Swiss-Prot record:
Protein name in the entry: Dehydrin Rab16C
Ranges of biased composition (kind: Basic and acidic residues): 147-164
PROSITE patterns: DEHYDRIN_1, DEHYDRIN_2
Pfam families: Dehydrin
PANTHER family: DEHYDRIN RAB16B, DEHYDRIN XERO 2-RELATED
Family to which this protein belongs: Belongs to the plant dehydrin family.
Species name: Oryza sativa subsp. japonica (Rice)
Domain of life: Eukaryota
Biased composition (Gly residues): 42-51, 128-138
InterPro entries named in the record: Dehydrin, Dehydrin_CS
Length: 164
């Protein structure tokens, strides 16, 4: 069939570089599979209907780029030893830290090392906040100079205008 290609009356199976069918010389275009001009040569190389094409294999290459998921779970590998230094955490401590409610022992140890500073971490004293929110409460005085650490949200709230 190679010697009949491109001549009038014989369908030339033309494809682009991607294997897609390309319109013929007379604008006939690509036909549906099985609906082309069937050409049966003597050698039987292309025995069958014209217009049938081999599917192109698509290769997925990432180019060496690692794709990571958006979720992340990290925990510090060291913690305060109470003497101003750091010590490595063991596997047991890391697992306990990830479990919900697994930090019960850590809070008691930290409170014993810190002594009684007057209240647990995260508690806020809202003095004068009885009533229907008249805005006469005292904010900002809940930490004062007692040496308590401020929470992350409290630091943000402190920086917002109009929240005093």
């Amino acid at each position: 069939m190679e010697n009949y290609q491109g001549q009038h009356g014989y369908g030339a199976d033309r494809v682009d570089v991607y294997g897609n069918p390309v319109a013929g010389q007379y604008g006939g275009g690509a036909t549906a599979p099985g609906g082309g001009h069937g050409v049966m040569g003597m050698g039987g190389h292309h025995a069958g209907a014209g217009g049938q094409f081999q599917p192109v294999k698509e290769e997925h290459k990432t180019g060496g780029i690692l794709h990571r998921s958006g979720s992340s779970s990290s925990s510090s590998s060291s913690e305060d030893d109470g003497m101003g230094g750091r010590r490595k955490k063991g596997i047991k401590e890391k697992i306990k830290e990830k479990l919900p409610g697994g930090n019960k022992g850590n809070n008691q140890q930290q409170q014993q090392m810190m002594g009684n500073t007057g209240g647990a971490y995260g508690q806020q004293g809202h003095a004068g906040m009885t009533g229907a929110g008249t805005g006469t409460g005292v904010h900002g005085a809940e930490y004062g100079n007692t040496g308590e650490k401020k929470g992350f949200m409290d630091k943000i709230k402190e920086k917002l205008p109009g929240q005093h």
